[in-house]
Amino acid sequence: MKNKYYPLRSSMDELSAKNDNEIDLEKGPLPEYNSEDGSTLPPYSENINLKDPKQMGANNPNLFNTDESTTPPDYGEDSLSITHRENHSSGTADNSSTSPLKKAFLSFISIFVLNVPAVCYLTYKDALFKDYGKDEWVYFGVWCAICLMIFISLWYFYETWIKAVKVTVIFLAQCIKVTVVFLAQCVKVISIGLFNIRREMMIIIWLLWLIICCILFGCVKSGDLNLNKALIYSTCTISAVLLLIVSSVCIPFWTFERTLAKLAKVFLLQSGIVLVLNGTMFLRGKHFEWTGCEIEASVLFIMGNVLFLCEMECPGALIRTRNSIRNGIAFILGGIGNAMMGLANAFRGGNDNNNNIPLGEMDVEGEV
């Protein structure tokens, strides 16, 4: 018995049969298929692996389950349409147009920003709607018409100018980023250069403070400039503080903790100078034209400059001087201590010798 149709067991078989019944213009009409003896191959057998899932799984039984008791999956038009909608729903975004209200609002904001400078200028000149004549009102009407045309153009070409604004903002942001990076590199190079020439920079600072303090001293003493004494005292103290801070070349002068340590040393030095000067003046009973504060400021200023010059000429001289003074004091104190220990040992030794004399010898010495 020859059949001109295929038995339909599922929707997939129905779809396969529908495709097989179509005539291929290149291969001609479909040949007849004898399902009993199998003498004639199915139509377009080279495409059978793409048509019949069970034929595809004939060589590989694990690929499809050919058990007739199991219902094959439903590949109907509804499931295909659902799959098609799912694939397209996650692929592209919604390209719905922007609402007219949003277009109008952004266009109005643009016109408002454009008119803000003009309104501010007229308000600053006190000419906003004041003493307007015929010509001024004509200009105002023309300007309103221009703004209206610009508003309509912005509303109509909303997508175009929004894209242009976005591109411009991105370009400006990149320019700002490049400029900031360039300035940061310049600052880094300048700071490295200043650090490498820090000795020369400190000499320049010292010269500037020296000139300023000398000018202030001269003006105050000559009477040409009436300054408060606190100004000259603070100037001298600040100069000494600055010079002592930057005196150690090997230590970065921008280190906060070491700067505080230098300030503490300056205050201790200042207190020592005050005590020495006041004690000397009290012991000698002499009176100078300058007060104790003026002498203190002058000595502190001179001492700071001398120490600074010594450090500039011989880096590390202050540290070596401090160590030398400390070692000298330790040596002197050690010598004094050794001498005292020697005397103590001598007295102790004499007492021990007297206590160790035999009694017979003491009697003989007594008889003699």
Curated annotation (Swiss-Prot):
Keywords: Cytoplasm, Endoplasmic reticulum, Membrane, Toxin, Transmembrane, Transmembrane helix, Vacuole. One of its GO terms (biological process) is meiotic drive. Residues 1-98 are annotated as: Disordered. Residues 11-29 have a biased composition (Basic and acidic residues). Residues 57-72, 89-98 have a biased composition (Polar residues). Pfam families: WTF. GO terms for cellular component: ascus epiplasm; endoplasmic reticulum membrane; Golgi apparatus; vacuolar membrane. The keyword Nucleus does not apply. The chain crosses the membrane at residues 105-124, 139-158, 170-192, 202-221, 234-256, 266-283, 328-350. The keyword Metal-binding does not apply. Belongs to the WTF family. Promotes unequal transmission of alleles from the parental zygote to progeny spores by acting as poison/antidote system where the poison and antidote proteins are produced from the same locus; the poison component is trans-acting and targets all spores within an ascus whereas the antidote component is spore-specific, leading to poisoning of all progeny that do not inherit the allele. Homomer. Forms protein aggregates. The two isoforms can interact with each other and with themselves. High sequence similarity is required for their interaction. This is Meiotic driver wtf23. It comes from Schizosaccharomyces pombe (strain 972 / ATCC 24843). The gene is wtf23.
